C-alpha cells in the first residue's frame, strides 16, 4: 500500500533552507549535520522509486510466492527487492546528483572556512569581481554529480546486466 508515502511527500515539501538551521541546532556543526542534510535531499527519490518498484511486482508472482508459503521476508528479499532493483537504481542516480546539492547546502549555515558552499557565498557577495569562482564551483559540482551518477550506473550495470538497460520494466 501507500502507508508512509504521504508522510514522505509532505516531508519533502519542507524547503531545505528551513530544515538546515534546525538540524544545526539539534546536531551541531559537525559532519553528522552535513550528512543529515544530504540525506534529507536524497531519501525522497530512493524511497519513491523503491515503493513504485515494489508496487509493480506482478500479482501472479506474488500469488506464486504465497502459494508456496513464502514468509514476508522471503517475499521481500526474494521477489520484491530483486524486481524493484532497476527502479531503485534510478532513484539512486537521482539521489547521487541531489547529494552534491545537499553537501553544498550543508556548508552554508555553518560559517565553514572552506568548501564549495563558501566559494558560492563569496562569489555571490562579490559577483562583479569574482564570477569565475562561481563558474568553477558550478563546473566542479556538475562534474562531481556526473561522477556519482556514473558510479551508480556502473554498479547497476554490473549488478543487473541487461536489466539495467531497461529490459525488465
PLM regions: where:
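Transmembrane alpha-helices
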Residues: 36-40, 72-105, 152
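Non-cytoplasmic
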Residues: 91-146, 150
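Functionally critical, cavity-lining and gating residues within the transmembrane helices
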Residues: 16, 20, 45, 63, ...
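C-terminal transmembrane helix and the adjacent membrane-cytosol boundary/short C-terminal tail
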Residues: 55, 135-169
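Transmembrane-helix boundary motif in ABC transporter permease subunits
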Residues: 1-8
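Short cytoplasmic-facing helical segments at TM-TM junctions of multi-pass membrane proteins
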Residues: 49-88, 120
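Generic hydrophobic transmembrane alpha-helix motif, especially the helices
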Residues: 8-45, 52-53
Amino acid at each position: 500500500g501507500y502507508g508512509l508515502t504521504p508522510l514522505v511527500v509532505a516531508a519533502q515539501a519542507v524547503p531545505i533552507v528551513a530544515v538546515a538551521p534546525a538540524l544545526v541546532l539539534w546536531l551541531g556543526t559537525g559532519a553528522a549535520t552535513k550528512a543529515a542534510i544530504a540525506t534529507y535531499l536524497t531519501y525522497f527519490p530512493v524511497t519513491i522509486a523503491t515503493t513504485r518498484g515494489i508496487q509493480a511486482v506482478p500479482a501472479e508472482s506474488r500469488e506464486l510466492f504465497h502459494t508456496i508459503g513464502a514468509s514476508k521476508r522471503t517475499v521481500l528479499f526474494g521477489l520484491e527487492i530483486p524486481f524493484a532493483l532497476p527502479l531503485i537504481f534510478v532513484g539512486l542516480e537521482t539521489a547521487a546528483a541531489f547529494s552534491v546539492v545537499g553537501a553544498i547546502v550543508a556548508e552554508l549555515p555553518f560559517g565553514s572556512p572552506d568548501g564549495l558552499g563558501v566559494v558560492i557565498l563569496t562569489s555571490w557577495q562579490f559577483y562583479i569581481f569574482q564570477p569565475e569562482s562561481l563558474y568553477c564551483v558550478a563546473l566542479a559540482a556538475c562534474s562531481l554529480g556526473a561522477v556519482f551518477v556514473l558510479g551508480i550506473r556502473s554498479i547497476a550495470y554490473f549488478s543487473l546486466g541487461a536489466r539495467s538497460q531497461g529490459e525488465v520494466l
